[in-house]
């Protein structure tokens, strides 16, 4: 099997479909499952597999009814990986947020969906009364300007390749 990458587009220009499709599908399944695991959510791999197969139009011997939140996570991962060359906009990001929190809740906590946050945000760990603060996010009133700056950079930076931009974006927020 030969793999040719067109340097001007960072795209694989030829692969055997017989090998590529199953590898791509398994990679997507791992992306969805592992991304969710990082956030503390353990997903049923067969639900993820079925959702991906349906959305990609693949034949799958056991299509099963998938929970709405799994379909939402799959939608986000598919959009991010298949449409990475599209401009990243506020509307697209908020659409992803809506896909992830379709119920309007994060656990048992109601949240404002598909809009920038309006309150404070901290990343903490530890038991109640012994919390450790790892990060305090910028004030809510600064979020629109910070997001505009980020979107300007992510869409217009030509200095960095896509992998490095993804790493920088991860640390930006």
Annotate each PLM feature.
Residues 1-173:
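FIC/Doc superfamily catalytic core
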